[in-house]
Amino acid sequence: MSIEIVQKSLFNIIEAVADAVTASQATKRCRLVAVSKTKSADLIEACYSQNQRHFGENYVQELEEKSDVLASKCLDIRWHFIGQVQSNKIGKICNSPGLWCVETVETEKHARIFDKEWSKHGANLSPLRVLVQVNTSGEDNKGGIEIGEAPKLAEFIRKECQNLKFDGFMTIGSFDNSHASGENPDFEKLFKVRQTWAEQTGESADSVELSMGMSDDFLQAIHQGATSVRVGSKLFGAREYKNK
């Protein structure tokens, strides 16, 4: 997809997000995270030039390479790691220039390692934002902690990980729910997880994020309370994989 088409798509998506927020009774704000996996640094830079700042990567190697290439060109780019976390790669994630948030923390073990690694790589920076990934669909092929355990993990991060900032909850909805009409039960469940956490802690639910919704269902996610949506193919076109 050409730079011009991507920039036009970005403009249209930003407008759609803004309109959806205005119409939503469940959220007053929503961030667009442009999911750039398998896409070139040039396309990311083209979006950055149009004031897009938040970008998401699923693969550690891509995050490493792109963040390094763009560090001197896109000075305030904000990278989100949104892929499955592997313990032995957490150090590489934390060492990526411009890392802003890890959205896929699902165990205390991973939280502890991120806390330790960020103290090395991000010693002069603010605490690393992390989201607790919740498996709202109950599918075995989806990452995330069980719904009932999510508030507990959030509190573990808040109380035990001084180099991390618990910043909310994230989910990847099931394919069927994402392509059905009407209310999405996965989004409803994540919204309730945040409410439960707020009730248990006395904190404001609105003080933390709800990252839910992707290219096919981000408007519905905003309708149901998303404060951050992850849009890839609708912005950049279909994923591109090298021939093996």
Swiss-Prot record:
The modification N6-(pyridoxal phosphate)lysine is found at residue 37. InterPro entries: PLP-binding_barrel, PyrdxlP_homeostasis. Keywords: Pyridoxal phosphate. It comes from the Eukaryota. GO terms for molecular function: pyridoxal phosphate binding. GO terms for biological process: vitamin B6 metabolic process. One of its GO terms (cellular component) is cytoplasm. PROSITE patterns: UPF0001 (PS01211). Pyridoxal 5'-phosphate (PLP)-binding protein, which may be involved in intracellular homeostatic regulation of pyridoxal 5'-phosphate (PLP), the active form of vitamin B6. NCBIfam families: YggS family pyridoxal phosphate-dependent enzyme. Belongs to the pyridoxal phosphate-binding protein YggS/PROSC family. This is Pyridoxal phosphate homeostasis protein.
